Structure formats: structure tokens, C-alpha cells
Curated annotation (Swiss-Prot):
Post-translational modification: N-glycosylated.
UniProt protein name: Allergen Act d 3
Lineage: Eukaryota, Viridiplantae, Streptophyta, Embryophyta, Tracheophyta
Keywords: Allergen, Glycoprotein
Length: 36
């Protein structure tokens, strides 16, 4: 999940936090940090 985000940089395509587990939100935030 985060690997795909980091490679593509398409954060808008990520599943919405409410659609998945709470960990997805945390991993998404981590991906944003690493991308910076």
C-alpha cells in the first residue's frame, strides 16, 4: 500500500481512512513523511 503511494506519488488514489482499518491512515501519514 505505502510502497505504491511512494512510487506513484498519487496520494489522492489512496483508499479513504474510513473505508479501511485505522492502520491505513497511520501508514498513509508515514508515506507522506517519507515522500518529503
Amino acid at each position: 500500500f505505502t510502497d505504491g503511494l511512494m512510487k506513484n506519488g498519487n496520494f489522492e488514489l489512496a483508499p479513504k481512512p474510513e473505508d479501511m482499518x485505522g492502520t491505513v491512515r497511520v501508514e498513509s501519514l508515514k508515506a507522506v513523511k517519507y515522500x518529503d
